[in-house]
Curated annotation (Swiss-Prot):
Gene3D superfamilies to which the protein is assigned, alphabetical: P-loop containing nucleotide triphosphate hydrolases (3.40.50.300)
Role, per record: Has nucleotide phosphatase activity towards ATP, GTP, CTP, TTP and UTP. Hydrolyzes nucleoside diphosphates with lower efficiency.
Substrates-to-products reaction catalysed: a ribonucleoside 5'-triphosphate + H2O = a ribonucleoside 5'-diphosphate + phosphate + H(+); 5-methyl-UTP + H2O = 5-methyl-UDP + phosphate + H(+); CTP + H2O = CDP + phosphate + H(+); ATP + H2O = ADP + phosphate + H(+)
GO molecular function, one term: ribonucleoside triphosphate phosphatase activity
Keyword Lipid metabolism: no
Residues involved in ATP binding: 9-16, 109-116
Name recorded for this polypeptide: Cancer-related nucleoside-triphosphatase homolog
Keyword Acetylation: yes
Residues with N6-acetyllysine modification: 165
Gene assigned in the entry: Ntpcr
Pfam families reported in the protein's UniProt record: NTPase_1
Protein family (similarity comment): Belongs to the THEP1 NTPase family.
Keywords: Acetylation, ATP-binding, Hydrolase, Nucleotide-binding
E.C. number(s) listed in UniProt: 3.6.1.15
Length: 190
């Protein structure tokens, strides 16, 4: 039986929007929900990067176009974007660790949007995700990229897990998937 839910699909198809709708429904049903999502940062109509936003409202840069890496830090780049690993880890890791450690008798949902190339530069993040997927009582709802080019080890590991249900989000189905996503999470509580 599936315990965790992951959405996949091309960029811009609506994965994060679906995650945000699922958060609202799950919170209103009384389930504790924590985690983070990524959002585009635009300037004068152009995408200049991505921010990490925690569900408690903290926000910081994940990546920016053409920015310089911090002195003494290795450059982590995905295409035109330079990843700010320090900022990402300062925001995402405490949220994941908190969600995992505050697991009592009740189930908790941990939102991880997304597990992609930028985020996977962080070894502590990879370890935290694996920990979350293995912790009883934690239900992970996340996003993973469509397979393209060189496989991402953690993403492939997630796809192959028997306790993971992967929904492929398309423009045709994105407005009808929410009840299915919520149903998998709700059935994980029993």
């Amino acid at each position: 039986m599936s315990r965790h839910v992951f959405l996949t699909g091309p960029p811009g198809v609506g994965k994060t929007t679906l995650i945000q709708k699922a958060i609202e429904v799950l919170q209103s049903s009384g389930l504790p929900v924590d985690g983070f999502y990524t959002q585009e940062v635009r300037q004068e109509g152009k995408r200049i990067g991505f921010d990490v936003v925690t569900l408690s409202g903290a926000q910081g840069p994940l990546s920016r176009v053409g920015s310089q890496p911090l002195p003494g830090k290795p450059e982590c780049r995905v295409g035109q974007y330079v990843v700010n690993l320090d900022s990402f880890e300062q925001l995402a890791l405490p949220v994941l660790r908190n969600a995992g450690s505050s697991c009592g008798p009740k189930h908790r949902v941990c939102i991880i949007d997304e597990i992609g190339k930028m985020e996977l530069f962080s070894q502590p993040f990879i370890q935290a995700v694996r920990q979350m997927l293995s912790t009883p009582g934690i239900i992970v709802v996340g996003t993973i990229p469509v397979p393209k080019g060189k496989p991402l080890a953690l993403v492939e590991e997630i796809r192959k897990r028997r306790d993971v249900k992967v929904f492929n989000v398309t423009r045709d189905n994105r407005n009808s998937l929410l009840p299915d996503i919520v149903a998998v999470v709700q059935s994980s509580r029993t």
